[in-house]
Amino acid sequence: MKLCVTVLSLLVLMAAFCSPALSAPMGSDPPTACCFSYTLRKIPRNFVNDYFETSSLCSQPAVVFQTKKGRQVCANPSEPWVQEYVDDLELN
């Protein structure tokens, strides 16, 4: 009886610590960041220190700028100022 309780306890603990991502098929995770609207104003270039592009799985393309204060701002990738910031960040 003690053996059954011990084995059952171990199985429950193992199930609790298993990550669901390990059992999911590759590529089934949803995108981590999508933008549903863009900023209406051009943000000052000196506020921005990094950027990334949203996943192609998102409903609309976007560039997400990371500010020095840690905020994320969604921007329209077809805007000239957004392309200029991306080019500048790539060079630096």
Swiss-Prot record:
GO biological process: antimicrobial humoral immune response mediated by antimicrobial peptide; cellular response to xenobiotic stimulus; chemokine-mediated signaling pathway; eosinophil chemotaxis; inflammatory response; positive regulation of cell migration
Cell compartments where the protein resides: Secreted
One Pfam entry name: IL8
Main subcellular localisation: secreted
Coiled coil start-end: none
CDD domains per record: Chemokine_CC
GO CC terms in record: extracellular space
Disulfide bonds: C34-C58, C35-C74
Swiss-Prot/TrEMBL keywords: Chemotaxis, Cytokine, Disulfide bond, Inflammatory response, Secreted, Signal
Signal peptide: 1-23
Cross-referenced PROSITE patterns: SMALL_CYTOKINES_CC
InterPro entries noted in UniProt: Chemokine_b/g/d (IPR039809), Chemokine_CC_CS (IPR000827), Chemokine_IL8-like_dom (IPR001811), Interleukin_8-like_sf (IPR036048)
Gene Ontology molecular functions: CCR chemokine receptor binding; chemokine activity
Subunit architecture: Homodimer. Interacts with CCR5.
Biological function: Monokine with inflammatory and chemokinetic properties.
Family of the protein in this entry: Belongs to the intercrine beta (chemokine CC) family.
Protein name per UniProt: C-C motif chemokine 4
